[in-house]
């Protein structure tokens, strides 16, 4: 299997309305897909996509 076609763990860091830093974890092919998944599964991120301040690949 091609290594580029494997899912990798990503942590999406974001800040809520009180400026508290939170995180959500997803398996995705790249950071853009991790962002898309975060927006799909997290209502706050969906409504405030600019609250994301870091997307880190954990491998």
Language-model-detected regions and their locations in the chain:
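Short, mixed-charge low-complexity intrinsically disordered segments
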Residues: 39-59
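A short, exposed loop/beta-hairpin motif centered on an aromatic-Gly-Thr core
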Residues: 20-33
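Terminal low-complexity, poorly structured segments
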Residues: 3, 18, 33-35, 50
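A structural detector for beta-sheet-dominated domains
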Residues: 15, 29, 55-58
